[in-house]
Amino acid sequence: LAMLVPALLVAGAANAAEVYNKDGNKLDLYGKVAGLHYFSDDASSDGDMSYARIGFKGETQIADQFTGYGQWEFNIGANGPESDKGNTATRLAFAGFGFGQNGTFDYGRNYSVVYDVEAWTDMLPEFGGDTYAGADNFMNGRANSVATYRNNGFFGQVDGLNFALQYQGNNEKSGLFDQEGSGNGNGRKLAKENGDGYGMSTSYDFDFGLSLGAAYSNSDRTDNQVHKGTHNTRYGDRFDATAGGETAEAWTVGAKYDANNVYLAAMYAETRNMTGYGDADAIANKTQNFEVVAQYQFDFGLRPSIAYLQSKGKDLGGLNGDNFDSQGNHHYANKDLVKYVEVGATYYFNKNMSTYVD
């Protein structure tokens, strides 16, 4: 249970406050301050979770049909002592160029193209979006070192037809297996490393509120990840809790309806050698993921939400009880990694002030 009282949206990203707009140069500021408390039997998920978030978007007109732009977003945890200097994180930081109807190209820390579809169900007041997507897990959420090309309206020829192409450079720590690492790799957990990868997404927006979309990504796994999953000396390589495949893959399909105060969305996704689970370095060989959400926006400000999310791990290795039969023989296991029903509601006092329970 999460309760937020209150949330002050300095300006939501969709309605950012315009700071400057003159001579083809524009700067918008957005952010929020959230007083947030979790109630849980799990001590690690119980208590104060307050935070502040701030960001800006800038754009400059270079020539006709040619612009430069950038965005930065920063999160500051407000639930620790002032002596805690590490409770901050850069969520987004990228810059690029726009070419009118010919699309945009940018590089930096940005959302992955697989998240284009996942974002449709990641709409819950507090929770959600956690069956397989997550920051710094290959190309599933916010990620480092991504070069992204986006085109909305298919070069101005087909309204509603959008697509994106993306490349991600490696982000890995130096290892014991001739892995040189990258400059930003120190301190990364095993599941947060990645090799070079590519992704793509496409969607079509109908004029009555329905959108359909699909996305795919394929990445090299790092030597650290592959070695961990292929050098189990006790039960053999194939039974290690860390997947040992050379590549990590994800694909997803989804749909949403957003019209007449009704919001409905659903997605299905599968991953290979990608999704971390548990408290150690376990990485699932395969996951099957499903999310569905329904919301309604009342005119007086109330927005109730209900959702169902499930991630099933397939062919999981490890030394847990699930991996042994009654005779003590070791085998693969299938189990739910995420499974819950969400019920929540948000109340908007106005566009800049809200409160919610989830």
Regions found by a protein language model. Name each.
Residues L1-A17:
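Gram-negative bacterial Sec-dependent N-terminal signal peptides
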Residues Y30-A34, Q71-E73, G108-N110, A164-Q168, ...:
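Transmembrane beta-strands of outer-membrane beta-barrel proteins
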Residues M49-Y51, T88-T90, R142, G195-G197, ...:
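Membrane-spanning beta-strands of outer-membrane beta-barrel proteins
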